Amino acid sequence: MTENNEFDVADLRREYIRGGLRRSDLTENPLELFERWLKQACEARLPDPTAMCVATVDTNGQPYQRIVLLKHYDDQGLVFYTNLGSRKAQQLAENPHISLLFPWHMLDRQVVFLGKAERLSTLEVLKYFHSRPKDSQIGAWVSQQSSRISARGVLESKFLELKQKFQQGDVPLPSFWGGFRVKFDSVEFWQGGEHRLHDRFIYQREADAWKIDRLAP
């Protein structure tokens, strides 16, 4: 507490004692280590282990962040879906550089991907869209993401209207809904350590291989 008995965030601290990260723990390909950590996050029953903070930048250099769910990953990149009229999609159209952060607090871990985002093909988007629950498909039609609305009731009324409309048959893919693949060229792994001596390793793509360096915490 401060002199005025106000809540002081500077008083909040803890030690990171869940273990370290050594070079011998690393894999040649960062995606293999990411997959291992992601599976461990799932096994630890972390809430939303696929949630990632997506950072983009507007034309004025103003950064924006939001939480989005990872939906696929492989050597080609990491995939997420969104409304193409959203702020992030519009910013990526102007500047494809992007950062993805996975914050696994309960394991004292985080992973950061840096790269460029590119639009998915309509076929890829369509395949995923129809794998979603029908109500989620309808929800994609309802929201003009980031637009201003007068009340939540506007969304709920539109949802009920469209649910009736699409009661029979498949829900068509909205033209304004799509996805991005993040082709990454840098991945940093962070593991909390005692006395704030955290372990950090960064992978950077060099031609067809990955260069690995330890970073000071």
UniProtKB/Swiss-Prot annotation:
Annotated cofactor note: Binds 1 FMN per subunit.
UniProt cross-references to PROSITE patterns, sorted A to Z: PYRIDOX_OXIDASE
Molecular function as annotated in GO: FMN binding; pyridoxamine phosphate oxidase activity
Pathway(s) this gene product operates in, as recorded in its UniProt entry: Cofactor metabolism; pyridoxal 5'-phosphate salvage; pyridoxal 5'-phosphate from pyridoxamine 5'-phosphate: step 1/1; Cofactor metabolism; pyridoxal 5'-phosphate salvage; pyridoxal 5'-phosphate from pyridoxine 5'-phosphate: step 1/1
Cofactor entry: FMN
One example of a Gene Ontology biological process annotation: pyridoxine biosynthetic process
Pfam families, alphabetized: PNP_phzG_C (PF10590), PNPOx_N (PF01243)
InterPro entries linked to this entry: Pyridox_Oxase (IPR000659), Pyridox_Oxase_CS (IPR019740), Pyridox_Oxase_N (IPR011576), Pyridoxamine_oxidase_dimer_C (IPR019576), Split_barrel_FMN-bd (IPR012349)
Keywords: Flavoprotein, FMN, Oxidoreductase, Pyridoxine biosynthesis
Sites where the protein binds substrate: 13-16, 71, 128, 132, 136, 196-198
Signal sequence residues: none
Catalytic activity field: pyridoxamine 5'-phosphate + O2 + H2O = pyridoxal 5'-phosphate + H2O2 + NH4(+); pyridoxine 5'-phosphate + O2 = pyridoxal 5'-phosphate + H2O2
Domain of life per record: Bacteria
Binding site residues for FMN: 66-71, 81-82, 87-88, 110, 145-146, 190, 200
PANTHER family per the UniProt record, alphabetical: PYRIDOXINE-5'-PHOSPHATE OXIDASE, PYRIDOXINE-5-PHOSPHATE OXIDASE
Function: Catalyzes the oxidation of either pyridoxine 5'-phosphate (PNP) or pyridoxamine 5'-phosphate (PMP) into pyridoxal 5'-phosphate (PLP).
Oligomeric form and interacting partners: Homodimer.
Protein name: Pyridoxine/pyridoxamine 5'-phosphate oxidase
Record gene name: pdxH
